[in-house]
Every structure is written in structure tokens, then in C-alpha cells.
A protein has these predicted regions:
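A conserved SF2-helicase RecA2
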Residues: 183-238
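A short beta-strand element within the Helicase C-terminal
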Residues: 168-181, 206-209
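Conserved beta-strand segments of the P-loop GTPase G domain that flank and frequently precede/overlap
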Residues: 118, 159-160, 178-180, 210-211
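Conserved helicase ATPase core of P-loop NTP-dependent helicases/translocases
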Residues: 116-118, 125-164
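Signature of the SF2 helicase/ATPase Hel1-core->accessory helical subdomain module
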Residues: 1-13, 181-186, 195-198
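Hydrophobic residues at beta-strand termini and immediately following loops
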Residues: 56-58, 141, 210
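Inter-lobe coupling linker of SF2 helicases/translocases
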Residues: 1-114, 224-226
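Phosphate- and divalent-cation-binding pockets in alpha/beta enzyme and binding domains
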Residues: 67, 124-128, 187, 219
């Protein structure tokens, strides 16, 4: 393109009703994608690390899960479920907010002294905060707290996916626990990368996924294995 004006004239449509210049859509995006592929240079990075992924199977309250599935009723709020998102949230709470899942974390901490734990929901955070009472040094990275990566020989770093799947790095731990799975393969991959850095001293990195045999956990795992995003409405059948 000779100049910015030529590019805008050919590819950009502005919103005529906006109070300031606002792009409404782009034209001939296939041409732009072709230009992008031509100018990008592939720079493969040879990593010295190996990611060891292990699934830890934990049980859940199957009776409560089944009852919610049949009645579509929220036992915590004592009200009917309104939509697919609400029902999936309840399924996940039954599965994730279980003492046996917390016990699985304690087993991992017996083998690994410095652990990053990713979680989704506030009720998971509340349970994981119990690690402090169990004698562990606990720091957090979420929407309310941005504690730095802990220091010392033994610690736990509780990180919420939305806040901390990217934007920080850690080279003092070789272990990550996914207390619950994220819906997105991309987010899970970004989270794993927090400890997989070029300057990490570790050659083996351990990733533990806590999973149950519940239908929703199996469906989320399937979406992640296919590098997709889990779809709540498709899962519920709406």
C-alpha cells in the first residue's frame, strides 16, 4: 500500500453513527491474511523441557449430581436453574467442591514442595485457602490479589485462570496442579507455560489434572483433547 489512506479505503468500514472513529468491519480479510502469512517468520524454539501430564482421578457426589440433572434445581440457592450455564455451574460445583479433591492436592504436596495451583471458582479458592491451616505458605493471584510468586523452599501459589493464565512467569517450581479444568484448550496451554520458561533450571515439568468420572468432566476433557472450547449449550442439549 502506498499509504494509510489507500489501506483504509480498500479494507476498512467505519461506523457512521459512532461519536469517534470506530471500525465496524474489515473488507477482503482473505487478502490481509495472505499478506500476514507472507511477512511472518517462523522462529521455532528448541526447549530443553519435557511436560509430564498426569490425570488424578477423584470421586464426587454422584447422587447429588444425578438429582440436579433430573430436577434442574439449585440446592445451594434453593431455586430452579434458569439456563445451560447455570446448570453446568452446578454440575461443576458438585464435582469440584469435594473434600476428596482437596485430599488429592495434599497428596501432590507430599511429593512436590513448590506448587502452582490453577482454579476457576471462588468456592474452590475458599477450600484451597485451607492449605494455610494445614501448614503451607499460601499466596494468591486473582482479581483481588496479585501476590508475587512466593519464595522459599516450600509454598503454594493459588492462581485463577482468568487473572493469571498469562502475564507472569515462574522458574522456581516444576509442578502445576489444575484443581479444575478450564473450558478452553488455549487457556490451559497458556497456564502450563507459566512454569515452562527458557531459563527454568528444570528439565521435567509435572502437570497434574484433577478429574472425575462425571459427564461434565469427561466432556470438558474431550474438548481440551481436541483443542476446542467446551460448549455448555451443546452439552446440555439445547
Amino acid at each position: 500500500y502506498k499509504n494509510r489512506t489507500e489501506f483504509i479505503r480498500r479494507h476498512v468500514v467505519f461506523d457512521n453513527f459512532a461519536k469517534f472513529p470506530q471500525v465496524q468491519r474489515y473488507l477482503e480479510t482473505g487478502v490481509l491474511e495472505n499478506y500476514r502469512r507472507q511477512i511472518l517468520v517462523d522462529m521455532p524454539v528448541e526447549r530443553h523441557t519435557v511436560r509430564v501430564r498426569r490425570s488424578i482421578h477423584v470421586k464426587h457426589d454422584e447422587e447429588l449430581y444425578s438429582r440436579i440433572s433430573k430436577t434442574r434445581f439449585d440446592p445451594w440457592k434453593d431455586e430452579p436453574v434458569q439456563n445451560a450455564g447455570g446448570l453446568c455451574y452446578l454440575f461443576r460445583r458438585v464435582v469440584n467442591d469435594d473434600s476428596r479433591r482437596y485430599a488429592a492436592v495434599l497428596d501432590v504436596l507430599k511429593r512436590h514442595p513448590r506448587v502452582v495451583i490453577f482454579y476457576n471458582f471462588d468456592y474452590e479458592l475458599e477450600r484451597l485457602r485451607g492449605l494455610e491451616k494445614d501448614g503451607f505458605s499460601v499466596s494468591e493471584y486473582n482479581g483481588r490479589r496479585h501476590d508475587p510468586v512466593p519464595e522459599g523452599e516450600s509454598w503454594v501459589y493459588l492462581v485463577q485462570y482468568t487473572s493469571g493464565a498469562e502475564g507472569w512467569n515462574c522458574t522456581t517450581s516444576d509442578t502445576m496442579v489444575f484443581y479444575s479444568l478450564n473450558y478452553s484448550y488455549r487457556v490451559m496451554e497458556q497456564a502450563e507455560g507459566r512454569i515452562d520458561r527458557l531459563n527454568t533450571p528444570y528439565s521435567k515439568l509435572f502437570y497434574y489434572r484433577l478429574v472425575s468420572n462425571s459427564p461434565i468432566d469427561r466432556a470438558i476433557q474431550d474438548a481440551i483433547s481436541r483443542k476446542k472450547v467446551f460448549n455448555e449449550r451443546a452439552f446440555i442439549g439445547l
